[in-house]
Design a protein with these regions (language model features):
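Periplasmic-binding protein-like
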Residues: 32-42, 61-63, 99-105, 148-167, ...
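Segments of small-molecule ligand-sensing domains
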Residues: 238-245, 249, 256-308
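Extracellular/periplasmic periplasmic-binding protein-like sensory domains
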Residues: 167-247
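Extracellular glycoside hydrolase catalytic/binding regions
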Residues: 61-62, 68-85
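Glycine-rich, charge-decorated loop segments at or immediately adjacent to ligand/cofactor-binding or catalytic sites
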Residues: 71-76, 138-142, 195-208
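Short beta-strand elements in bilobed, periplasmic/extracellular small-molecule ligand-binding domains
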Residues: 3-16, 72, 102, 121-136
Length: 309
């Protein structure tokens, strides 16, 4: 209301993941007065809502699901599809002096490997096996960095300890090369967003190693826009917001104003960034759903800044 001047009534319904409960909700008078439906969260609950929404031309926003089995022109999907996860890796692999190297550990994330290999189709790459036990450390990784090329290193290890060792070894190799008067290596590391579950990683290495991660959502607590939102949220609810809270805010800021215009067509191809995560909605080839195409590429810089695109 304060930003756009709209006064909106919000009705909340809990489906409890029960089909009978969902049918009751769809028949509810307050539900049928809605001009915008956000949810349900789970894809299997969408068909009951979509049937009503199509009949009365009410937009439906799916905030979290990567929808596979529901197709409708009234449906907007906020979560980017898995198939688009590494769309932004292409420009990292381009260049006359580019060298792409997959770094394997003793235990590797095979799903991540499959995703990367699919994204690298047609791109030449080399493989490097990192083994801490053979004391390869800096020496083995120094040879990767000192090749005079623009290196893209993709770390496939699925061990928190091993990932930390690899990142530390690369940072050490870079420091040693520069200290010996060598040309500063040019390199970027692509990591796995699932590393966030590792509690032992030295996050300072992310910056030293110019790490790039791909994520469905990004909200950095010390960013000014996030700090402002967090402060307002705490005042209102007495607790820190979760990622679901951020997504809910994004949904409101994108779709409530759109509700007052031609939502089906005015939004297509436009870029929306309510907080730090950006959304661009397009209909997928052969489908009717309006799907956010934008995975966030989070880049850690040596000057200890983070860029998001």
């Amino acid at each position: 209301k304060t930003q756009y001047g709209y006064s909106v009534r919000v009705d909340l319904f809990n489906t409890r993941q029960e089909s009978d409960r969902l049918r009751t909700i769809v028949d509810d008078a307050d539900f049928r007065a809605a001009r915008l439906i956000v949810g349900p969260v789970y894809e299997e609950e969408l068909p009951a809502v979509i049937g009503y929404a199509e009949e009365y031309a009410v937009p439906v926003v799916s905030p979290l699901a990567d929808v596979k089995n529901v197709d409708s022109d009234v449906l907007f999907q906020m979560a980017p599809p898995q198939m688009r996860k590494y769309a932004k890796i292409e420009e990292l692999t381009q260049g006359e002096h580019k060298q792409v190297i997959l770094i394997y550990g003793e235990k590797n994330d095979r799903e991540f490997e499959r995703e990367i290999l699919a994204a690298l189709q047609g791109v030449p790459y080399a493989r490097h096996n990192y083994r801490y036990a053979v004391k390869e450390g800096d020496q083995g990784l120094s040879s990767l960095l000192a090749n005079g090329k623009d290196n893209l290193l993709i770390v496939l290890s699925d061990s928190g300890l091993e990932v930390d060792r690899i990142l530390a070894a690369i940072a050490s190799a870079n420091t040693n090369l520069v200290a010996r008067g060598k040309t500063p290596p040019r390199f970027t590391i692509v990591g796995n967003s699932r590393w966030n579950r590792f509690g032992n990683l030295d996050r300072a290495l992310y910056f030293k190693d110019r790490l790039v991660l791909f994520s469905t959502y990004h909200a950095k607590r010390d960013a000014e826009v996030i700090k402002t939102f967090d402060s307002d949220y705490i005042k209102a609810f007495g607790a820190l917001p979760s990622l679901y809270s951020y997504r809910g805010y994004d949904a409101a800021m994108i779709f409530v104003p759109a509700m007052y215009s031609d939502i089906q067509y005015d939004m297509e191809g436009r870029r929306y960034t309510p907080l730090q995560t950006s959304y661009t909605f397009q209909q997928m080839p052969g489908g009717s759903n309006h799907v956010n195409q934008n995975w966030m590429r989070v880049s850690y810089r040596p000057d200890f800044t983070i860029t998001v695109d």
